[in-house]
């Protein structure tokens, strides 16, 4: 019996789940809206909402907890500089999950997970290094 056990396993090991949610949280903080499967979105929501609450607190211990949970320090800093002040007056409910139909390949239910009162300009922001032709010659 699994009384009191919350959370989905999502067919992954504990370390894989931890890394996946950390990376998805970074993507959500960076772009403020991502598309994923519905079960992943439902599991990601409390993970990120707790990080936003840390951003609202803003003290040193909260920063250290956020840096421990997120692998990229640049986007962890956005929690405290942008998102924390934005949601200072809101008592929870920083994220919404919208159903987005089914994926063609395997009919998996898809969802859009986004911040409430999100910044529209953050969507499609730079996603990291891009392969450029000619770099192989220099190496």
From Swiss-Prot:
- Protein's name according to its UniProt entry: Large ribosomal subunit protein bL17
Its subunit composition reads:
Part of the 50S ribosomal subunit. Contacts protein L32.
Organism the protein comes from: Parvibaculum lavamentivorans (strain DS-1 / DSM 13023 / NCIMB 13966)
Q: Which GO terms describe its cellular component?
A: cytosolic large ribosomal subunit
State if RNA-binding is listed as a keyword. Answer: no
Keywords in alphabetical order, please. Answer: Ribonucleoprotein, Ribosomal protein
> Mind telling me which PANTHER family this protein's record contains?
LARGE RIBOSOMAL SUBUNIT PROTEIN BL17M, RIBOSOMAL PROTEIN L17
Upper classification of the organism: Bacteria, Pseudomonadati, Pseudomonadota, Alphaproteobacteria, Hyphomicrobiales
Q: Which gene encodes it?
A: rplQ
**Any one GO molecular function term:** structural constituent of ribosome
Gene Ontology biological process terms from the UniProt entry: translation
């Amino acid at each position: 019996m699994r009384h009191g056990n919350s959370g989905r396993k999502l067919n992954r090991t504990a370390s894989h789940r931890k890394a996946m949610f950390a990376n998805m949280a970074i993507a959500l903080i960076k772009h403020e809206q991502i598309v994923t499967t519905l079960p992943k979105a439902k599991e990601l929501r409390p993970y990120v909402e707790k990080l936003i609450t840390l951003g609202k607190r803003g003290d040193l211990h909260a920063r250290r907890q956020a840096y421990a949970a997120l692998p990229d320090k640049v986007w962890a800093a956005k929690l405290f500089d942008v998102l924390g002040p934005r949601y200072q007056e809101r008592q929870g409910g920083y994220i919404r999950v919208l159903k987005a139909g089914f994926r063609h390949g395997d009919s998996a239910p898809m969802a859009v997970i986004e911040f409430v009162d999100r910044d529209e300009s953050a969507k499609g922001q730079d996603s990291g290094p891009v392969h450029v032709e000619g770099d192989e010659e220099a190496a």
